[in-house]
Amino acid sequence: MKKLLIIGNWKMNKTYDEARDFINAFSNAYALNGAKISENIEYGIAPSFTNMSLFNKELLEKTNINLVAQNINENRSGAFTGEISAQMLKSINAKYVIVGHSERRQNYRETNKIVNQKAKAAIENGLIPIICVGESLEEYEAGKTKAVIKKQIKQSLEALDLSKIVVAYEPIWAIGTGKVATAEVAQQICKFIRSITSKDLIIQYGGSVSPSNIENLMKQEDIDGALVGGASLEVDSFFELITFNALK
């Protein structure tokens, strides 16, 4: 049975009190039903920076949840107002960090080169970067998906140790839209990514993943997990995601 990595990306959601309520509810759910989580499932949450302190070492150990960051700065330290370094994240027990999310690429003009620099900074500080790639609706409809993905992969993963990273395929047209690539389409692109990288690379799919479609997506040979947005904001739906393959 292959290992699966399921990460919830909260984006800019939840106040401190709301995040604390989620954690309390998740801890209770884990105490009652944690045994339903298969040993092949690794899972985590990427909260906002203001809520990361709630995911303390005791919680991480008690519930086996991983702390994930939504972004980092590529520099180690210095005069970079408002930024967070990989070293800082490592010091609070973060394990993964998302880099190159399409919202960062589009809204903050992050290039493949910047994504590559951030991934290198993560690896150098003992974090595992989850490097996002994906095409726009216009590129998808024009049949340019593979060309776009290939360029992103080549430049974003340049000189990286592929055994120390995760790649998340997130078609931009499926993020937060309710639209989802069919499992077959997602598999086709993830298989393509594997063909131009490594057979052992961990590849996630992201884009409107929900409890209703995760099982079919995770059945695909070249999909090794999910990067989840909205469905990770509620304890019930997140718990459904990480127990989708529990014995019925």
Curated annotation (Swiss-Prot):
It is found in: Cytoplasm. Substrate binds at N9, W10, K11, G176, S208, G229, G230. This is Triosephosphate isomerase. It catalyses: D-glyceraldehyde 3-phosphate = dihydroxyacetone phosphate. NCBIfam families: tim. Pathway: Carbohydrate biosynthesis; gluconeogenesis; Carbohydrate degradation; glycolysis; D-glyceraldehyde 3-phosphate from glycerone phosphate: step 1/1. Homodimer. Pfam families: TIM (PF00121). Involved in the gluconeogenesis. Catalyzes stereospecifically the conversion of dihydroxyacetone phosphate (DHAP) to D-glyceraldehyde-3-phosphate (G3P). The active site is at H101, E170. It is an enzyme of class 5 (isomerase).
